[in-house]
Amino acid sequence: MAAPCLRTPGVQLLSMSSRPGRLFTPGSWSFCSSATSSRPLNAQRLAEKLRAQKQEQKAKEVRVPTNPVQRRVQELVRFTQQLQRVHPNVLAKELSRRILHQDNDLVVINKPYGLPVHGGPGVQLCISDVLPILAKMLHGHKAEPLHLCHRLDKETTGVMVLAWEKDMAHQVQELFRTRQVEKKYWAITVRVPLPSAGVVDIPIKEKEVQGPQQHHKMTLSPSYRLDNGKMVKVRASRDAHVAVTQYQVLSSASSSALVELQPVTGIKHQLRVHLSFGLDCPILGDHKYSDWTRLAPQKLSAGTLKKLGLQQSKARYIPLHLHARQLILPALGSRTEELLLTCKLPHFFARSLLRLGLDMPNQDQSRGNKARHVEAR
């Protein structure tokens, strides 16, 4: 069969650009004309031309922001979407590159941003989906699936523990439940917490938010209230859960801070609620808990927006700056010493520290010779 662009006397070529699945677009006739005037256009050369033109068109359609921060945000969003849409084998390979520690009992990874741990409505791919594939990549085709030992929120990055055996996973889960695992999170906050160090001990419960955007949020359920300047104990809500968070400001600027958080308890969204509603310092990029009455992009001061190089209309693209920085596991299984695991910050988190003028603390202090310290790659 002759190539479609070869001209035949008395035959008029018709454009099919308006039809779905078209072979030619209006711009493709130019190279067909020039090509046929010099030498025949065979099927291979035609395919190469069409492929090059398609790539060129796709490059033109991608709008690259001129602002560096907007470019980083766009890259983050695109990378997150790709992680949820890739083939499970590709995601498992990405997680294998993020392994922080591996032994006969455990595999510890540096969880990426925007990746759910469990499936649910609207979730195309999650970490639990690819654990069987990851296990086979690490231990061969006969390997049993890895098991989750705990969970992190979709937007939270950092240390995440997996176990080879179900029994070991239950043992680690019991350590978390009985508060024998020491956890440290880092967060960038909007405004600076006062005092600079302390303990937030306020119960938390889930509550329905009335209004045009009816939804549910976790909120504070205080055991005390102020009455004429005195603290008066109130009846505890049956739905409230004890929630305790230790915090310390590591670095601060005029309108933001780097805060280290140690959750004593493990209630849903505990750190976000205690910072936002307990200390009035929401986490940067927390578009859910920055305002109680509605779900809307976080409102930032003009000074903060200027430092980030963003306009308020682009604030919705700012990711949640909450990172599971460090985990200390007691001796367990084949290990005779505790294991200290430290994860480096995501690129977007480190860049925000730089832009906001927040200093990185010195290298975390080790816990002595009995602790085995592992630093994330």
Curated annotation (Swiss-Prot):
| GO biological process terms held by the UniProt record | mitochondrial tRNA pseudouridine synthesis; mRNA processing; mRNA pseudouridine synthesis; positive regulation of mitochondrial translation; RNA splicing; rRNA pseudouridine synthesis
Localization annotation: Mitochondrion matrix; Nucleus; Cytoplasm
User: Which one of the record's GO molecular function terms can you name?
Assistant: tRNA binding
EC number of this enzyme? 5.4.99.-
One GO CC term on file: mitochondrial matrix
Q: Which UniProt keywords apply?
A: Cytoplasm, Isomerase, Mitochondrion, mRNA processing, mRNA splicing, Nucleus, rRNA processing, Transit peptide, tRNA processing
Residue range covered by the transit peptide: 1-46
Q: What are the catalytic residues?
A: 153
Task: Look up keyword Transferase and say if it applies.
Answer: no
What sort of enzyme, by top EC class, is this?
Answer: isomerase
Q: Which Pfam families match?
A: PseudoU_synth_2
Q: Which reaction does it catalyse?
A: uridine in 5S rRNA = pseudouridine in 5S rRNA; a uridine in tRNA = a pseudouridine in tRNA; a uridine in mRNA = a pseudouridine in mRNA
Q: How does it assemble?
A: Interacts with 16S mt-rRNA, mt-tRNA(Phe) and mt-tRNA(Met). Forms a regulatory protein-RNA complex, consisting of RCC1L, NGRN, RPUSD3, RPUSD4, TRUB2, FASTKD2 and 16S mt-rRNA.
UniProt lists the family membership as follows:
Belongs to the pseudouridine synthase RluA family.
Q: What does this protein do?
A: Catalyzes uridine to pseudouridine isomerization (pseudouridylation) of different mitochondrial RNA substrates. Acts on position 1397 in 16S mitochondrial ribosomal RNA (16S mt-rRNA). This modification is required for the assembly of 16S mt-rRNA into a functional mitochondrial ribosome. As a component of a functional protein-RNA module, consisting of RCC1L, NGRN, RPUSD3, RPUSD4, TRUB2, FASTKD2 and 16S mt-rRNA, controls 16S mt-rRNA abundance and is required for intra-mitochondrial translation. Acts on position 39 in mitochondrial tRNA(Phe).
Its recorded name reads Pseudouridylate synthase RPUSD4, mitochondrial
Q: Which organism is it from?
A: Mus musculus
Which taxonomic lineage is given here?
Eukaryota, Metazoa, Chordata, Craniata, Vertebrata
